[in-house]
């Protein structure tokens, strides 16, 4: 049975958790090390925090079953990007007493579109 059909009856939250787990496993296969998942702050949330070498990688996981309302990547608008940056800054302050200005970090996206393999975009925020 297709992945999308199995997910039809799940809530959005459990669907999100399923794809976050798939993204985590995919990134671990690419050599990244898992640090934390689902970090929530008043200013925003972080889906996955990973590490590649000495770089902290903040990962946004997006999925779309079809493009009727735009692609997974198109759903990461300016407002979402700002919340992502703010949450990462809070995480760095909490965990390492650093900020985005001083830490070695980047922002990646893992996008799932219908039955396609995951699309990993490194340094999405450039």
UniProtKB/Swiss-Prot annotation:
Superkingdom of the source species: Bacteria
Gene3D superfamilies (alphabetical): 3.40.1350.10
Coiled coil (UniProt feature): none
GO MF annotation, one: nucleic acid binding
Listed Pfam families: UPF0102
SUPFAM superfamilies: Restriction endonuclease-like
InterPro entries membership: Restrct_endonuc-II-like, tRNA_endonuc-like_dom_sf, UPF0102_YraN-like
Assigned protein family: Belongs to the UPF0102 family.
UniProt name for this protein: UPF0102 protein HD_0802
């Amino acid at each position: 049975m297709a992945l999308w059909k199995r997910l039809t009856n799940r809530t959005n939250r459990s669907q999100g958790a399923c794809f976050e787990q798939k993204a985590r496993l995919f990134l671990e296969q690419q050599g990244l090390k898992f640090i934390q998942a689902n970090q929530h702050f008043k200013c925003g949330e972080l889906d996955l925090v990973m590490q590649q070498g000495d770089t902290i990688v903040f990962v946004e996981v997006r999925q779309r079953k079809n493009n009727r309302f735009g692609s997974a990547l198109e759903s990461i608008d300016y407002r979402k990007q700002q919340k992502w940056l703010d949450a990462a800054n809070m995480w760095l302050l909490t965990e390492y007493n650093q900020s985005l200005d001083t830490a070695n970090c980047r922002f990646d996206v893992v996008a799932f579109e219908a039955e396609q393999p995951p699309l990993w975009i490194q340094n999405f925020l450039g």
